[in-house]
């Protein structure tokens, strides 16, 4: 990851005078335990998990009136394609929103990590627009789309993987598959080395 470009995406994190213990990258088992602790009280089709950033399912993505009501300006479909959630630019024709589609499988062997930086850039740019509001979705809104939102928070908001999971889980229950969790672990380790967290 090009550090100059990555730095353009990050917001500075303010640290207090007290030095915390060094960050310990989480194991896969500890991440899965963290995800099993359900924090969100209800199951919704769409939830705001970060200011102006929404995580949702296929139903939410197809509910044009709800998207208009929420003021969604950008949609990231992590389950694009004819045999998945087949929305797209044509589906949203006549609406003032931008569309970004990724043909990703919810499969532990699918490499979603190649999309981490491009999607983070897209979300950051969309949120930088006045009144920019982004929906990231897949079929169920718990694995593919959640993984991309977690990566965004790690890359652009300088969160650890654990912090990102806790942030999202406070608003929506998520469950990235084990392969996606491993890819997020790799990102967490790489960002940790680059930022000196450990």
From Swiss-Prot:
Listed InterPro entries: Atypical_DUSP_subfamA (IPR020405), Dual-sp_phosphatase_cat-dom (IPR000340), Prot-tyrosine_phosphatase-like (IPR029021), Tyr_Pase_AS (IPR016130), Tyr_Pase_dom (IPR000387), TYR_PHOSPHATASE_DUAL_dom (IPR020422)
Tissues with expression: Highly expressed in the testis (at protein level). Also found in the skeletal muscle.
Enzyme Commission identifier(s): 3.1.3.16, 3.1.3.48
Domain of life where this protein originates: Eukaryota
Keywords: Hydrolase, Protein phosphatase
Gene Ontology terms: biological process: dephosphorylation; meiotic cell cycle; negative regulation of MAPK cascade; protein dephosphorylation; spermatogenesis
Membrane spanning stretches: none
Catalytic activity: O-phospho-L-tyrosyl-[protein] + H2O = L-tyrosyl-[protein] + phosphate; O-phospho-L-seryl-[protein] + H2O = L-seryl-[protein] + phosphate; O-phospho-L-threonyl-[protein] + H2O = L-threonyl-[protein] + phosphate
Disulfide bonds, paired cysteine numbers: none
GO cellular component: cytoplasm
Matching Pfam families: DSPc
One Gene Ontology MF term: protein serine/threonine phosphatase activity
Residues of the Tyrosine-protein phosphatase domain: 45-193
Family recorded in the similarity comment: Belongs to the protein-tyrosine phosphatase family. Non-receptor class dual specificity subfamily.
UniProt xrefs under PANTHER family: AGAP008228-PA (PTHR45682), DUAL SPECIFICITY PROTEIN PHOSPHATASE 13 ISOFORM B (PTHR45682:SF10)
Function noted in UniProt: Dual specificity phosphatase that dephosphorylates MAPK8/JNK and MAPK14/p38, but not MAPK1/ERK2, in vitro. Exhibits intrinsic phosphatase activity towards both phospho-seryl/threonyl and -tyrosyl residues, with similar specific activities in vitro.
Official protein name in the record: Dual specificity protein phosphatase 13B
Source species taxonomy: Eukaryota, Metazoa, Chordata, Craniata, Vertebrata
């Amino acid at each position: 990851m090009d550090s100059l470009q990555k730095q353009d995406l990050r917001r500075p994190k303010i640290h207090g005078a007290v030095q915390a213990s060094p960050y310990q990258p989480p194991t896969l088992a500890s991440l899965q335990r963290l995800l099993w602790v359900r924090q969100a009280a209800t199951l919704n089709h769409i939830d705001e998990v970060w200011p102006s950033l929404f995580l949702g399912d296929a139903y939410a993505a197809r509910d044009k009136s709800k998207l208009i009501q929420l003021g969604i300006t950008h949609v990231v479909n992590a389950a694009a394609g004819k045999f998945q959630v087949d929305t797209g630019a044509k589906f949203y024709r006549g609406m003032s929103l931008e569309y970004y589609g990724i043909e990703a499988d919810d499969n532990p062997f699918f490499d979603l990590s190649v999309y981490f930086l491009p999607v983070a850039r897209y979300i950051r740019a969309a949120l930088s627009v006045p009144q920019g509001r982004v929906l990231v979705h897949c079929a169920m809104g718990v694995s593919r789309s959640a993984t991309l939102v977690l990566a965004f928070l790690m890359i652009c908001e300088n969160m650890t993987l654990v912090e990102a999971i806790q942030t999202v889980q406070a608003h929506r229950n998520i469950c990235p598959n084990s392969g996606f969790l491993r890819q997020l672990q790799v990102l967490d380790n790489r960002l940790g080395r680059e930022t000196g967290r450990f």
